[in-house]
Every structure is written in C-alpha cells, then in structure tokens.
Amino acid sequence: MAAQMSESDQIKQFKEFLGTYNKLTENCFLDCVKDFTTREVKAEEMTCSEHCLQKYLKMTQRISMRFQEYHIQQNEALAAKAGLLGQPR
C-alpha cells in the first residue's frame, strides 16, 4: 500500500507546483506577448506560447530522465563497492 503524504507535504508540493506554474507562465508571457493594442490573443502569440510550454515540458522530462540515470549509476556503483568490500580476500 502506498504511503499517504502528510498534509504539510501536500501543501509544500502544491506551493512548489504553483511557483513553477507561475514562473513558466511569466516567462512564456514575457517571451511571447509583445502587442497590447488588442484584447484578443493573436495567432503568433498562441503559437509562441504553445512552443514555450512544449519546450519546457520536454526539458523537464529530459532532466528527470537524466536524474534517474544518474541515480541508477550511483546505486550500481555503491552496490559494486559494497560487493567488493563484503568479499573475503
């Protein structure tokens, strides 16, 4: 059975999510929206925003994969080292 997150951990995780969301929104807005003469979102702004979001998601996924690979390598190295230390000479 999966362990439940405490309420404080859930709040912390949600705050981190909101911080990330707000930063992403601000960065993409500043990069993509240049014309404030109309209330409508222009096609170029929409396309730019979509590309900005896609790029961020791909970057996040790639970083996560690299982070997992790094931890697997570290665990394998520790296991190999422990195996060598545990063997009689």
From Swiss-Prot:
Recorded topology in the membrane: Peripheral membrane protein
Keyword Protein transport in record: yes
TM region positions: none
GO molecular function, one term: metal ion binding
Cellular location(s): Mitochondrion inner membrane
Keyword Membrane attached: yes
Location of the motif Twin CX3C motif: 28-52
Record-level GO cellular component terms: mitochondrial inner membrane
GO biological process: protein transport
Keywords tagged on the record: Chaperone, Disulfide bond, Membrane, Metal-binding, Mitochondrion, Mitochondrion inner membrane, Protein transport, Translocation, Transport, Zinc
Disulfide bridge partners, by residue number: C28-C52, C32-C48
Entry comment, domain topic: The twin CX3C motif contains 4 conserved Cys residues that form 2 disulfide bonds in the mitochondrial intermembrane space. However, during the transit of TIMM9 from cytoplasm into mitochondrion, the Cys residues probably coordinate zinc, thereby preventing folding and allowing its transfer across mitochondrial outer membrane.
Oligomeric and partner information: Heterohexamer; composed of 3 copies of TIMM9 and 3 copies of TIMM10/TIM10A, named soluble 70 kDa complex. The complex forms a 6-bladed alpha-propeller structure and associates with the TIMM22 component of the TIM22 complex. Interacts with multi-pass transmembrane proteins in transit.
UniProt record similarity statement: Belongs to the small Tim family.
Biological role: Mitochondrial intermembrane chaperone that participates in the import and insertion of multi-pass transmembrane proteins into the mitochondrial inner membrane. May also be required for the transfer of beta-barrel precursors from the TOM complex to the sorting and assembly machinery (SAM complex) of the outer membrane. Acts as a chaperone-like protein that protects the hydrophobic precursors from aggregation and guide them through the mitochondrial intermembrane space.
Protein name (database record): Mitochondrial import inner membrane translocase subunit Tim9
Organism: Xenopus laevis (African clawed frog)
